[in-house]
Amino acid sequence: MNNEMMSIIFASDNETKLNELTIHRTTASLPFCGRYRFIDFTLSNLVNSNITTIGIVTRSNYSSLTDHLRMGRDWDLNRKNSGIAIFSPYSSNTSRSMFKGKIEAMYGILDYMERASEEYVIVTNSNIASNIDFEDVYSQHVSNGADITMLTYTSHPTSSKRVIVDK
């Protein structure tokens, strides 16, 4: 278990771009290859990097997400200490309205992050289909003495009539 890192996952990112698909569910719970959901990639990356304290920030239509997660049983995250914590859009003690952005949402769960024993926080979205070793990212972050480390990728636009294949 990595006692230095925890994660905050935003489950409702890009919903305005996926209107028809996210009318009744969050981006995180969109099906992928039938059995899986987009959040499975992110959770698997975190668990494979030995990160077991994970907060999931939701915005709306998250019942299918909670049904799928089952409090993290499939990732061995259903535990008394650490594990998965799901935050509704009204989690803040200081506001009675829904958060407007990620910073405001994180401020709303600041007490959760301060109570955690981990020093570093990975902030990620749930709609990323990737394979990331966060232990390597952490090692680079610490060895460089960085305050913030950001992972990015380059997207290559394609026309709708062709597909790019890695060689």
Task: Pin down the residues of each PLM region.
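Unchanged
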Residues: M1-K167
